[in-house]
A protein has these predicted regions:
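Gly/Pro-enriched, hydrophobic low-complexity segments
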Residues: 108-222
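An acidic-aromatic
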Residues: 49-142
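Generic preference for well-ordered secondary structure
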Residues: 5-6, 21-23, 106, 113, ...
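A generic structural signal for short, solvent-exposed coil/turn residues
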Residues: 29-31, 44, 103-105, 152-154
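Short amphipathic alpha-helical surface micro-motifs
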Residues: 16-23, 91-95, 139-143, 176
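A structural signal for the main folded, soluble domain(s) of proteins
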Residues: 18, 22, 33-37, 52-54, ...
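N-terminal leader/targeting segments and the immediate start of mature chains
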Residues: 1-44, 66-68, 89-90
Length: 222
């Protein structure tokens, strides 16, 4: 039963329901060999190109980009993609956590985490994690997913927002970022990889609004 198919009573145990959504995420299968290609970063009238490789160890290598800030940005996107494709069992990740139902709204049913991850929250709907609110390295990140890509072997987030904030005060840390991701399979039945990511970031404090596009082309398995 999915979060949207029937009302969920607040306070009930949601471990099995949350596990279904967790296991519905698309991840790379064991034995993933890695891939390489051409990377393009653009912002305004500026475009920078280079080459990249993600190895079987899921470590990213980017070459041919001299601008350190752009190099860091491209590497960061590739790292983020790889880290979210790692396949870890539900027990490996969440064995020390409990999952309790909160209220249900149009975004999904709230999942309140207890145990090791106390303070974290999720929302789930139709076996998709539609909201993530997690404490990571002294900050809080809140992600809302509004559209996904169904691969036939799990879903990938397509359209989503991300906002960082202070865990104590709730003050925002930077502007909200809106993402649109396009994925493609490397070959027939092959692993799905990122083809394009567009990030629009709102202005915050002295930091202006920005729009960055990352494209990954000529993709080939290693």
């Amino acid at each position: 039963m999915t979060a949207s198919s029937a009302p969920v009573k607040p306070g009930c145990d949601l471990r099995d329901t949350f596990q279904k959504a967790y296991e519905n995420r698309y991840t790379w299968t064991p034995g993933f060999s890695g891939y390489r290609g051409r990377c393009l970063w653009s912002q305004g009238d500026q475009t920078v190109t280079g080459t990249f490789e993600i190895g079987a160890d899921l470590k990213a290598k980017v070459e041919g980009i001299e601008d350190e800030q752009v190099l860091k940005a491209v590497h960061s996107q590739l790292w983020e993609v790889a880290i979210h494709r790692v396949r870890r069992s539900f027990e490996q990740t969440h064995s020390s956590n409990t999952f309790t139902a909160g209220e249900t709204d149009n975004i999904g049913t709230e999942v309140i985490v207890g145990g090791k991850g106390e303070g974290d929250r999720y929302r789930i709907k139709d076996d998709v994690v539609t909201m993530v609110h997690r404490h990571i390295h002294g900050t809080v990140v809140t992600i809302f997913t509004t559209a996904v890509t169904h691969t036939g072997a799990g879903y990938l987030s397509h359209t989503y927002t991300s906002q960082y904030s202070d865990p104590a005060s709730g003050d925002l840390r930077g502007g909200k970022s809106s993402f649109k991701d396009t994925f493609t399979p490397l070959n027939d039945g092959g692993p799905w990889v990122l083809k394009e990511r567009v990030i629009q970031t709102e202005a915050h404090g002295d930091a202006p609004a920005g729009l960055q596009t990352f494209r990954f082309e000529s993709l080939a398995a290693l």
